[in-house]
Amino acid sequence: MAEPLRGRGPRSRGGRGARRARGARGRCPRARQSPARLIPDTVLVDLVSDSDEEVLEVADPVEVPVARLPAPAKPEQDSDSDSEGAAEGPAGAPRTLVRRRRRRLLDPGEAPVVPVYSGKVQSSLNLIPDNSSLLKLCPSEPEDEADLTNSGSSPSEDDALPSGSPWRKKLRKKCEKEEKKMEEFPDQDISPLPQPSSRNKSRKHTEALQKLREVNKRLQDLRSCLSPKQHQSPALQSTDDEVVLVEGPVLPQSSRLFTLKIRCRADLVRLPVRMSEPLQNVVDHMANHLGVSPNRILLLFGESELSPTATPSTLKLGVADIIDCVVLASSSEATETSQELRLRVQGKEKHQMLEISLSPDSPLKVLMSHYEEAMGLSGHKLSFFFDGTKLSGKELPADLGLESGDLIEVWG
């Protein structure tokens, strides 16, 4: 838009020129100046437009009366094209043309690219391009490569790359390597493993639950097979779930065999018996072993007499227990020795206890020899004591006042 043309002439200003004019009033008038002349005055026309054309300046001749020549003032410049126009010089002097400074507006697409980083930083910095097809060629982590491989790129994007682009060369090299791998290993799947997602996690969770249910079902089938009562029909049982147990027959606790130890005189007999078997079988075996009548066999456990009808399970006998077997006198001898004394002889050990019958007129030497023979201690030096008194063997039971049930101690 062009500004209106306006003639400009000399106008009075303050400063040194004005003071000189005021000071000349009191002086003598000067000679009259020459009549008015035609002096061309320069008028600036600023054509403002959006184009990049330069400013047009038009100079038109205007008749201006010649004024008095003031002292030359310092020219002023105004960068803005306001209503006052350009700076004025002294009257009569040729005006200088001042061009307005304008900023050149450029298209954003034509803006020059200025490097942000220095040369060293730029050489070591690889910016990631925005194109998805070029992202595959950038060095990345294995997970990123798997994502890019799964997503893929369309052939139109590969064709859009320039023929001389380094990205296109790298893409071609990568495709050639993949083709070589496929030719060398045609049966091998070289596709990357998919990343675990939320769906895969939920799928794994459901698979784990299914496996647990299958295990519980098989355990229930195993319990039903081991139980005595099977409610399932054989048609419903699967051949894969059958369990065969190869074991011997389960015997009850009462029919279990164990070795019973029987001590008779100087012998120790080991006899296998059952827990539910009565001790009468033991009595018969010992009578046959000693060649005497079963009525003369007496079994003792500690100081208590065992009944032939008792069983090892009722007596709670174990493998470490030992039973003493005593041979009693015959019935004919019993009538003769009805007045005999039954004396107990106890050795140093607890199991070395023996009950011996002795007549009141017999010396104690008979008791000592019978004990040594029964315990297998013949030839050993033994000492017999009664109430703390050492016995020589020549004493009679009546002399010592012995009665049935008295205890005689033996020390070796």
UniProtKB/Swiss-Prot annotation:
Residues 86-96 have a biased composition (Low complexity). Residues 175-184 have a biased composition (Basic and acidic residues). GO terms for biological process: positive regulation of transcription by RNA polymerase II. One of its GO terms (cellular component) is nucleus. Highest level detected in spleen, thymus and testis. Residues 168-227 form a coiled coil. The modification Phosphothreonine is found at T309, T311. The modification Phosphoserine is found at S49, S51, S79, S81, S83, S118, S191, S197, S307, S362, S383. It is found in: Nucleus; Cytoplasm. Residues 341-412 form the Ubiquitin-like domain. There is a cross-link at K120 (Glycyl lysine isopeptide (Lys-Gly) (interchain with G-Cter in SUMO2)). Residues 1-38, 58-115, 136-206 are annotated as: Disordered. Keywords: Coiled coil, Cytoplasm, Isopeptide bond, Methylation, Nucleus, Phosphoprotein, Ubl conjugation. Residues 8-30 have a biased composition (Basic residues). It comes from the Eukaryota. In T-helper 2 (Th2) cells, regulates the magnitude of NFAT-driven transcription of a specific subset of cytokine genes, including IL3, IL4, IL5 and IL13, but not IL2. Recruits PRMT1 to the IL4 promoter; this leads to enhancement of histone H4 'Arg-3'-methylation and facilitates subsequent histone acetylation at the IL4 locus, thus promotes robust cytokine expression. Down-regulates formation of poly-SUMO chains by UBE2I/UBC9. Interacts with NFATC2, TRAF1, TRAF2 and PRMT1. Interacts with UBE2I/UBC9. This is NFATC2-interacting protein. It comes from Mus musculus (Mouse). The lineage of its organism: Eukaryota, Metazoa, Chordata, Craniata, Vertebrata. The gene is Nfatc2ip.
